[in-house]
Protein backbone atom coordinates (compact mmCIF):
# COMPACT_ATOMS: atom_id res chain seq x y z
CA UNK A 1 0.00 0.00 0.00
CA UNK A 2 1.43 3.33 -1.07
CA UNK A 3 0.30 6.52 0.66
CA UNK A 4 0.47 9.47 -1.70
CA UNK A 5 -0.77 13.05 -1.92
CA UNK A 6 -2.18 12.30 -5.39
CA UNK A 7 -3.34 8.83 -6.41
CA UNK A 8 -3.36 7.87 -10.09
CA UNK A 9 -4.20 4.62 -11.85
CA UNK A 10 -0.99 2.89 -12.93
CA UNK A 11 -2.46 0.25 -15.27
CA UNK A 12 -5.80 -0.51 -16.96
CA UNK A 13 -7.01 -2.69 -14.09
CA UNK A 14 -6.57 0.01 -11.44
CA UNK A 15 -9.87 1.35 -10.11
CA UNK A 16 -10.31 4.58 -8.16
CA UNK A 17 -12.84 4.25 -5.35
CA UNK A 18 -13.87 6.33 -2.34
CA UNK A 19 -14.02 4.65 1.06
CA UNK A 20 -14.88 6.57 4.23
CA UNK A 21 -14.06 9.85 2.49
CA UNK A 22 -10.63 8.62 1.35
CA UNK A 23 -9.62 8.08 -2.25
CA UNK A 24 -8.11 4.66 -2.94
CA UNK A 25 -6.80 2.69 -5.89
CA UNK A 26 -7.50 -1.03 -5.95
CA UNK A 27 -5.97 -3.36 -8.52
CA UNK A 28 -5.19 -7.00 -9.27
CA UNK A 29 -1.50 -6.15 -8.81
CA UNK A 30 -0.90 -5.62 -5.06
CA UNK A 31 1.94 -3.20 -5.84
CA UNK A 32 -0.59 -0.80 -7.38
CA UNK A 33 -2.66 -0.38 -4.21
CA UNK A 34 -2.63 3.27 -3.12
CA UNK A 35 -4.42 5.51 -0.70
CA UNK A 36 -4.54 9.24 -0.28
CA UNK A 37 -3.35 10.53 3.06
Curated annotation (Swiss-Prot):
Biological-process GO terms, alphabetical: translation
A GO cellular-component term linked to this record: cytoplasm
UniProt entry keywords in alphabetical sequence: Ribonucleoprotein, Ribosomal protein
InterPro entries: Ribosomal_bL36, Ribosomal_bL36_sp
SUPFAM superfamilies associated with the record: Ribosomal protein L36 (SSF57840)
Domain of life where this protein originates: Bacteria
GO MF entries: structural constituent of ribosome
Chain segments annotated as coiled-coil in the UniProt record: none
Pfam families reported in the protein's UniProt record: Ribosomal_L36
Database matches in HAMAP family: Ribosomal_bL36
Family note: Belongs to the bacterial ribosomal protein bL36 family.
Identification of the protein by name: Large ribosomal subunit protein bL36
Organism the protein comes from: Carboxydothermus hydrogenoformans (strain ATCC BAA-161 / DSM 6008 / Z-2901)
Gene that specifies this protein: rpmJ
Amino acid sequence: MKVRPSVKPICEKCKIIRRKGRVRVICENPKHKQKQG
